[in-house]
Amino acid sequence: MLAYWFLFALFALPALTERMRHPDDPRPQRLLAIFGVVMALMIGLRFHVGADFEAYELIFRRAAEIDLARSLQRGDPGYQFVNWAVGQLGGAMWQVNLICAAIFVWGLIRLCRAEPSPMLAALVAIPYLVVVVAMGYTRQAVAIGFIMAGIASLSRGGSVIRFALYVAAAALFHRTAVLVLPVAIFAGRRNH
C-alpha cells in the first residue's frame, strides 16, 4: 500500500506548486517525464497484481510457443504481437507488462501536457486510471494510452485522420477502442 501512496505523493507535491511557476519554466515538463518513468516502472514491474494476471500469463506462454501468424489469430493482434516478440526473445511476462505500461504512460503524459496543470491532471489519474485500470487490465490500459495520445493530438489541432490512426492502434490491443471514433465528430467544435 505504501508504494501507491508514494506514487500519489510524487505527483501531489509538485501539483501543489504548479500554478506558482512561470509558464516557460521547463522544469515541470522534465519532472513530469521523470515521474512518468517511475509510474511506468511501478505499473510494468507489478507481480500478480490485477484481475487478469493469470490469464495474461497464459496468453504469454501460449504466444511464445507458436509462430507469429497463429499467435495473431488468437486475439487482439497488438497485444499478441508484443507477447510473441517478447517470448521469441526469451523474455518474461514482466517485460510485456513493462512495454504495455510504457505505452499507457506515454499516452497519459501526452494528454496531461495538453492540460493547463499537467501534474494535477496526472495526479487525478492515479487513484483509478493508473492503480485500477493500468495495473489491472493491461490490454485496456494500452488502448486507453493510445486514445489519450489521440485526444492530446486533437487538442493541439491535430487532424481527425491522425486521431483515427491512434484509435486504430488502440484497437490492435482492445477492439472496443473503435467505440471512441465518434469523438472525432466533435473534435472541430469548441464551446465558447
Regions found by a protein language model. Give the residues of each.
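Terminal, non-globular segments
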Residues: 1-192
